[in-house]
């Protein structure tokens, strides 16, 4: 299975993708870290599945492991939970020569990365993502964040892991809804890339097929994202392409207040933005076919909400009174359009009822 290298100006690290890799965690961590204290951060769902075996491997490799368990779910991605982890690290006498490992989905990875980047001005950390969403998206690229009541990811840093270890077989323990929600990000990237990757997702007709093709789907998604990240670490240019579907998707997700998963909101956002900037190539229809096959939603009543634009207007990706919109001219042909928020608002209101 592939190993993808991320080579940045200030740091290099590897992303290893291999079935059964969960049985070799101790050896893999030994390759990048000397013996030290490790805080293994996990949640109340993933912990009971994998925490014991990974703790045992790390201990056998000579590491001193402290397990820190957070509640499962988006609500744990908070400043309050970060403070709880800071205090636990202080109690266990962690310093900058020690390290953190994130074992879980996107919430665990985002929170652990944020704590690693800020505790004592930075501790090394490793990602072991266990959900498809985390494996193809949040574990790669160095974005860390916590949420505020006003919205998602409003406090965060850019901070790269020192290693990412991905075992596609871990996806077999995911509930189907969580598997499918991660697939929305795969479809997003495949639509940006086009060509063989788009042909591959067109062959996926069920959640079972996602599992069957998981190693290839993960590797292709990460290869593209790593290429983008290496060219634009802090999202000042090309990396904005990865926000395809997220402008409206994040707003809907915030308004849904936990009713929708991130991937479900992105799926809705992909269709909405494609309808808003419809092309002769019928992008929305092509995306809808691929998304609906696995049970992802493509519309939602909240798209009609008067509060939708207010959420979009407070998106952290905006630049003053300007908004950067990513849409496709055709599959594999993404473009970034910068518009005044007032113009986008008018265009949104004009087509909002058709969503």
UniProtKB/Swiss-Prot annotation:
The encoding gene: aroB
Species of provenance: Latilactobacillus sakei subsp. sakei (strain 23K) (Lactobacillus sakei subsp. sakei)
GO biological process: amino acid biosynthetic process; aromatic amino acid family biosynthetic process; chorismate biosynthetic process
Gene Ontology CC, one term: cytoplasm
Subcellular location as annotated: Cytoplasm
Keyword Membrane found: no
Gene3D superfamilies the UniProt entry points to: 3.40.50.1970, Dehydroquinate synthase-like - alpha domain (1.20.1090.10)
Sample GO molecular function, one term: nucleotide binding
Residues annotated to bind NAD(+): 106-110, 130-131, 143, 152
Pfam families: DHQ_synthase, DHQS_C
E.C. number: 4.2.3.4
Keywords, ordered alphabetically: Amino-acid biosynthesis, Aromatic amino acid biosynthesis, Cobalt, Cytoplasm, Lyase, Metal-binding, NAD, Nucleotide-binding, Zinc
Cofactor: Co(2+); Zn(2+); NAD(+)
Cystine residue pairs: none
HAMAP family documented for this protein: DHQ_synthase
Function: Catalyzes the conversion of 3-deoxy-D-arabino-heptulosonate 7-phosphate (DAHP) to dehydroquinate (DHQ).
InterPro entries named among the record's database cross-references: Dehydroquinate_synthase, DHQ_synth_AroB, DHQ_synth_fam, DHQS/DOIS_N, DHQS_C
Chain ranges passing through the membrane: none
Family: Belongs to the sugar phosphate cyclases superfamily. Dehydroquinate synthase family.
Top-level taxon of the source organism: Bacteria
Protein name (record): 3-dehydroquinate synthase
Bound cofactor: record note: Binds 1 divalent metal cation per subunit. Can use either Co(2+) or Zn(2+).
Pathway: Metabolic intermediate biosynthesis; chorismate biosynthesis; chorismate from D-erythrose 4-phosphate and phosphoenolpyruvate: step 2/7
Catalytic activity annotation: 7-phospho-2-dehydro-3-deoxy-D-arabino-heptonate = 3-dehydroquinate + phosphate
